[in-house]
Structures are given as C-alpha cells and as structure tokens.
C-alpha cells in the first residue's frame, strides 16, 4: 500500500501512514505522484479521496496498464484525462458516492477478521461549534464524536 499526501504533509503524517501499514509515502508537493508510482511499478488501483479534481487528473499516469482510479472525493471541477492514457494502457476512472449494503457488510467483516478499530477523537458536547469548525477546515483527525459530561455519545431520540 502506498499513501499519497496532498496537504498537511510532514513527518507526523508520514509516521502515521507507516504505522497504519503504508509501504511507501509520497508527498505530492515534493514530488510528482504519477512519476513516483511508476518508479514503484505503477499502481493497480488508486483510491482518490482528496477533494481536488486537479490532483485526480494527474493520478492516471501513476497506474500500471489495466489499472483504475476510483474517485470518492469531489470538488465539482472537471477531471482532465487524455484518451491515449485510457485506451493504450487500458486504464479507467470510476466514481462512487457510497458503497452498497453488501460492501458495508464485507468491510465490517474484514475489519473484524483483521482486528481493525476506528480512530476516534472525542469532543465535549459544549465544544460542538469548535469541533464543527475544525471539521469544515479539514483539521479533524479521522472521526469526531461529541460526548456528554458522562463521556457517552448520544444521538437524537427516534420518535
């Protein structure tokens, strides 16, 4: 697995990526991700989570023949790709807004088998506005959960 970081890069981000299982870390501001991926043999699949159409456009060149870019992050802008890259190397670009119910079940089953646990940042309910602002600014670390004074996360009643 290779991690390509597009923003908020740095030593702490690289250390986290390696701790989470990355074999390679590519800082897109320091190097060309497509060129670096090709030097590593090319990617079979690139999961593009960044909300940047411009960065998605540059990823196709990092694929090996037959590879695919799956775009799940969006900003509403166009993704520019050349037909030569698609046809001659049999590469593809796909998009998905959410997986199917079966995808969710498969993901949870895989998580149980691999003992994968979510990384959660808890925030007191009184700091909800600050937590929301951090989320909007892209400063939230993984998932943020609002908790009450007793430390319990609560949702709205279902009536």
What are these regions (language model features)?
Residues 5, 28, 70-72, 96:
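Conserved acidic donor-binding loop of glycosyltransferase catalytic domains
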Residues 6-7, 74, 98, 149:
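Cofactor-binding loop segments of dinucleotide-utilizing enzymes, especially the Rossmann-like FAD-
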Residues 63-64:
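Helix-to-beta-strand junctions that scaffold the AdoMet/dcAdoMet cofactor pocket
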